[in-house]
Amino acid sequence: MSLNRATVAKRYSQALFDLLSEKDQLESGYTELQELRRIFQDNPQLSTMLSDASLQVADREALLQPLLKQASPYIKNLIQMVYDYGRMENMVDIIDQFQVLYDELHHTVYAEVTTAVELSAEQKSQIEAVYAKRVGAEKVVLSSKVDPDVIGGVIVKAADTILDGSLRTKINRLRQQLLA
């Protein structure tokens, strides 16, 4: 029975997270995994090639060596184990799941803010501070999106939460009340 990608990612990431936490190497491991993610994202065919059984083992291992060479011992073990079990296509999923665990530990929340006009840096940091206080996060990382249909106000989306303070929504609610 084959495990699905999410299950594989959760198991590997949790094991690595626990190990790095125990060995007091969580921060350096996190930084290293971010770099590894960037390598796989910049080279989208890499994981496929490392898993491609039609390539000679020597060719695949030649692709693997630069990753192992620059890795710390625990990350090197992760890469080698994932490669040995033929799960290189799960590597970014594993790193993404590790990121979730890391963010939970550090109370970091990612949110998307939608406004009618571009926000200034000061406005973004005000929204980050207010939203962090509201959800109990130590840090909020915002990405912003401009949608003129919002008319005014702000919509903040994070995970399964939407805070809609847009003028468009207020107008729609008023319209519904008047038509009721």
Curated annotation (Swiss-Prot):
It is found in: Cell membrane. SUPFAM superfamilies: N-terminal domain of the delta subunit of the F1F0-ATP synthase. The lineage of its organism: Bacteria, Bacillati, Bacillota, Bacilli, Lactobacillales. InterPro entries: ATP_synth_OSCP/delta_N_sf, ATPase_OSCP/dsu. Coiled coil: none annotated. F-type ATPases have 2 components, F(1) - the catalytic core - and F(0) - the membrane proton channel. F(1) has five subunits: alpha(3), beta(3), gamma(1), delta(1), epsilon(1). F(0) has three main subunits: a(1), b(2) and c(10-14). The alpha and beta chains form an alternating ring which encloses part of the gamma chain. F(1) is attached to F(0) by a central stalk formed by the gamma and epsilon chains, while a peripheral stalk is formed by the delta and b chains. It is a peripheral membrane protein. This is ATP synthase subunit delta. PANTHER family: ATP SYNTHASE DELTA CHAIN (PTHR11910). The gene is atpH. Keywords: ATP synthesis, Cell membrane, CF(1), Hydrogen ion transport, Ion transport, Membrane, Transport. It comes from Levilactobacillus brevis (strain ATCC 367 / BCRC 12310 / CIP 105137 / JCM 1170 / LMG 11437 / NCIMB 947 / NCTC 947) (Lactobacillus brevis). F(1)F(0) ATP synthase produces ATP from ADP in the presence of a proton or sodium gradient. F-type ATPases consist of two structural domains, F(1) containing the extramembraneous catalytic core and F(0) containing the membrane proton channel, linked together by a central stalk and a peripheral stalk. During catalysis, ATP synthesis in the catalytic domain of F(1) is coupled via a rotary mechanism of the central stalk subunits to proton translocation. Disulfide bonds: none annotated.
